[in-house]
């Protein structure tokens, strides 16, 4: 499987880029098999694709807005998944729902034979990120509600309409191949992609292309700057007791959680500068006058390499065991999610850049620029030149 990532600024323009790239990705493989398609034919398809995708601007924006309106947290993307799979089914895609045992996960397929091109993008939102669209300051639709604060409402519109444009050309020109659409469910919780891989859903995929929003328009190859991580919940079991009447009878699970957190915070001094960790107490007991019999804490351990992630994870387990020993409680832990560091393909990155240059940057309006300046001021973002694309040099062998 090949993974590629590029940033998103304007959905319609990205759909055009996506389509152009997919044509380039599919046709060489077809040409090798059928000896049928020359460069001139490929270029003519690209020109037709530009017109095709540009005409779908309104539909793309409607999909972006609809997914934004759902604003569903990880593993709760019920309406989002129903909406997206409904559109795909109407356009001839076969849907497999509940993949990897995740109710809101699915995989959509159209076509047959090779090459098999998979397109993915995340669909979950962020807790307490409700925000009115087009407003450059905090103004929630519903105070405290979840919302799309990371652009996960944009990606599926891009890949779905790009895939539909590719499908049209494949049908028109009798081009064999398979298109696959999949969602990143619970991405904020690291909750699905590793399980898709584990269960073999990408086993026969020739290229997997992934889109995500960013601060500029381009694509990367090599190490893409994203850390890998492991998500772990540590749970402690003790004995309840009345905190005033008979505290000596209790074994506090909350004490164990707090001791683990204290121990880990002392460990931070000895971590590498690139190692990152965060935690939240997810269960701290019921009320102050009862010694908590159960408590839990949720950790993320992040780094750029598998070895350094593993070392943090191992240290966390040791500290948790020590906390359980000190409080005479029992500890168990559960891995909730995991992700390898991103390392993307050079050939796909260069092909994407070539097509980005052909399409060019979107034509920004005065309103676009005004909004951008307001957001930059709000987040104190450094000023950057307008970039058509970027390619990161690989920081380790391909």
Language-model-detected regions and their locations in the chain:
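Histidine/acidic-residue-rich, glycine-tolerant segments that coordinate divalent metal ions
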Residues: 138-147, 153-154, 170-292
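N-terminal secretory signal peptides that target proteins for export/translocation
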Residues: 1-12
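Acidic/His- and Gly-rich active-site-bordering loop/insert found
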Residues: 32-148, 157-179
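Bacterial N-terminal signal peptides
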Residues: 17-28
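Metal-dependent amide/peptide-bond hydrolase catalytic core
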Residues: 37, 258-398
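Divalent metal-coordination and catalytic microenvironments
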Residues: 67, 108, 119, 152, ...
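Sec/Tat-exported extracytoplasmic proteins
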Residues: 53-57, 64, 68-71, 92, ...
């Amino acid at each position: 499987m090949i993974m590629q990532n590029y940033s998103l600024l304007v959905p319609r323009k990205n759909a055009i880029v996506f389509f152009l790239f997919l044509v380039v990705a599919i046709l060489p493989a077809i040409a090798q098999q059928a000896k049928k398609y020359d460069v001139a034919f490929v270029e003519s398809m690209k020109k037709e694709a530009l017109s095709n995708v540009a005409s779908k601007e309104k539909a793309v924006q409607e999909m972006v807005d609809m997914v934004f309106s759902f604003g569903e947290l990880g593993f709760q993307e019920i309406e989002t998944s129903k909406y997206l799979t409904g559109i795909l089914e109407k356009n001839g895609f076969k849907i497999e729902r509940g993949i990897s045992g995740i109710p809101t996960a699915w995989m959509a397929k159209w076509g047959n034979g090779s090459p098999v091109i998979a397109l993915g993008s995340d669909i979950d939102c962020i807790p307490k990120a409700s925000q009115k669209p087009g407003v450059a300051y905090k103004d929630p639709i519903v105070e405290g509600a979840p919302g799309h604060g990371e652009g996960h409402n944009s990606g599926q519109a891009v890949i779905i309409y790009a895939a539909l444009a590719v499908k049209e050309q494949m049908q028109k020109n009798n081009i064999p191949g398979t298109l696959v659409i999949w969602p990143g469910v619970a991405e904020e919780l690291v909750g699905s992609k590793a399980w898709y891989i584990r269960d073999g859903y990408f086993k026969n995929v020739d290229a997997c292309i992934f889109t995500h929003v960013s601060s500029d328009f381009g694509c990367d190859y090599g190490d893409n700057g994203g850390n890998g991580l492991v998500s772990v919940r540590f749970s402690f079991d003790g004995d309840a007791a009345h905190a005033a009447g008979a505290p000596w009878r209790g074994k506090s699970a909350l004490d164990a959680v707090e001791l683990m957190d204290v121990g880990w915070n002392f460990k931070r001094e000895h971590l590498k500068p690139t190692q990152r960790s965060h935690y939240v107490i997810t269960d701290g007991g019921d009320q102050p006058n009862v010694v908590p019999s159960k408590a839990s804490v949720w950790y993320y351990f992040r780094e750029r390499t598998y070895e350094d992630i593993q070392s943090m994870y191992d240290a966390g387990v040791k500290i948790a065991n020590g906390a359980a020993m000190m409080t005479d409680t029992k500890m168990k832990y559960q891995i909730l999610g995991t992700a390898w560091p991103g390392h993307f393909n050079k050939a796909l990155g260069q092909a994407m850049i070539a097509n980005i240059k052909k399409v060019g940057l979107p034509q920004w309006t005065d309103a676009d620029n005004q909004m951008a300046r307001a957001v930059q001021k709000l987040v104190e973002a450094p000023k950057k030149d307008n970039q058509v694309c970027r390619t990161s040099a690989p920081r380790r062998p391909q």
